[in-house]
Amino acid sequence: MLSKQIPLGIYEKALPAGECWLERLRLAKTLGFDFVEMSVDETDARLARLDWSREQRLALVSAVAETGVRVPSMCLSAHRRFPLGSEDDAVRAQGLEIMRKAIQFAQDVGIRVIQLAGYDVYYQQANDETRCRFRDGLKESVDMASRAQVTLAMEIMDYPLMNSISKALGYAHYLNNPCFQLYPDIGNLSAWDNDVQMELQAGIGHIVAVHVKDTKPGVFKNVPFGEGVVDFERCFETLKQSGYCGPYLIEMWSETAENPAAEVAKARDWVKARMAKAGMVEAA
């Protein structure tokens, strides 16, 4: 794994739904992936993972050891429902408690990176106060992550507050902590009026992983690869030439499809072909 030029992973929600991680990791291995990214979203079912018992956590660690397929990252989107910028103190406190539990969970099972959703609020109206509370919440979260030696990494979003690497870098400079980095989504980055290549170059040195998906302006999910606006070859070329050597994660939501494995295999082949064209020869 350490000698592999391009670590390639798959998002949990691309694979069949369920709570058996041994089965999920075995399938990911069969499909040729190096790792799976766990989702902890705003649903009660996935939030419940943060309250797993010691035995449940050990079962995940054991599944990783048995298959050799890692779970190095968590997509923590639960803060849509419990935002750190909420003006409701009880909701905001719940958001911070979710963060604490997520960091503890990551520490227990070996997750290194928690991808954060860059929303001050999601279902409410944003304002100066929600942004201030969000900044303060991030500061408290990064302090917790530092003590646990876990990295928090901001996603580039489908939301104006965090829709460019430049904006996320502003938070990185404000927090000034090595445990806060960036986790750009080249689909989200491309769907806005960004100079995508310049943005990617600006983030080098702070990018710990990259989400790979296609998008259209205003459409951020479930756009089939090749039908959106993302110039994948140029993005891969820019990242390669800038010296980025980290993982790539194919983000899909095919868990309820008739044949999720077939959908994932098709997307994998499409993405790897673009990587090969970009000179990432090991991807072919």
Curated annotation (Swiss-Prot):
Record's function text: Catalyzes the isomerization of L-xylulose-5-phosphate to L-ribulose-5-phosphate. Is involved in the anaerobic L-ascorbate utilization.
Catalytic activity: L-ribulose 5-phosphate = L-xylulose 5-phosphate
Enzyme Commission code: 5.1.3.22
Protein name per its UniProtKB record: L-ribulose-5-phosphate 3-epimerase UlaE
Entries under Gene3D superfamilies matching the protein: Divalent-metal-dependent TIM barrel enzymes
Record SUPFAM superfamilies: Xylose isomerase-like (SSF51658)
Protein's organism: Salmonella typhi
Matching InterPro entries: L-Ru-5P_3-Epase, L-Ru-5P_3-Epase_Enterobacteria, Sugar_Epim/Isomerase, Xyl_isomerase-like_sf, Xyl_isomerase-like_TIM-brl
Family per similarity comment: Belongs to the L-ribulose-5-phosphate 3-epimerase family.
The organism's place on the tree of life at top rank: Bacteria
HAMAP family: UlaE
Major enzyme class: isomerase
Entry keywords, A to Z: Isomerase
Pathway assigned to this chain's UniProt record: Cofactor degradation; L-ascorbate degradation; D-xylulose 5-phosphate from L-ascorbate: step 3/4
Induction, per UniProt: Induced by L-ascorbate. Repressed by UlaR.
GO molecular function ontology, one term from the record: intramolecular oxidoreductase activity, interconverting aldoses and ketoses
BP GO terms, sorted: L-ascorbic acid catabolic process
